[in-house]
């Protein structure tokens, strides 16, 4: 996140958290560009998602009302949000809409389907959320692990 703040300060880059409620959609679009995903909401609003995956650990949902004004900005890659996924009910499409594309999609021998891996911060600790999606596109399992620390470098 510090890199994004530095970028914004030095180069005029935009970041999702800089926009205050009431900011028009067009202003957000002109500064951030197209969102990774856009979801139409009941009542005419939209929820835009901007992610820093695969290398970053943040994804922000910007919710706009039917009037096109920003209502809220929420960082969604959290242990609480992942933990709230209803297993056996949440679909791959919902996963994309709510969390954005993952860091990577892999397979493991112990599960028939795909494992979607997201990087995120959990109380200052770098973590992975492994979301297991079955062949029908339904989330069946969720695992959290700490991101491995780099090996210490050997001195010659």
What is each of the regions a protein language model found here?
Residues 1-3:
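Bacterial N-terminal signal peptides that target proteins for export
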């Amino acid at each position: 996140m510090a890199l994004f703040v530095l970028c914004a300060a030095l180069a005029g880059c935009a970041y999702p958290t800089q926009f205050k409620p009431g900011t028009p959609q067009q202003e957000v679009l002109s500064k951030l560009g197209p969102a990774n995903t856009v979801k139409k909401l009941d009542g005419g609003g939209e929820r835009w998602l901007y992610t820093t995956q695969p290398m970053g650990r943040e994804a922000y949902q910007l919710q706009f009302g039917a009037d096109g004004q920003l209502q809220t900005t929420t960082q969604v890659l959290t242990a609480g949000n992942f933990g709230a996924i209803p297993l056996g009910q949440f679909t791959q499409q919902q996963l994309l809409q709510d969390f954005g594309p993952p860091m990577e999609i892999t397979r493991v021998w112990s599960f028939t389907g795909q494992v979607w891996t997201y990087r995120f911060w959990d109380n200052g600790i770098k973590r992975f959320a492994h979301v297991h999606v079955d062949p029908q596109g339904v989330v069946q399992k969720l695992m959290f692990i700490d991101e491995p620390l780099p090996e210490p470098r050997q001195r010659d």
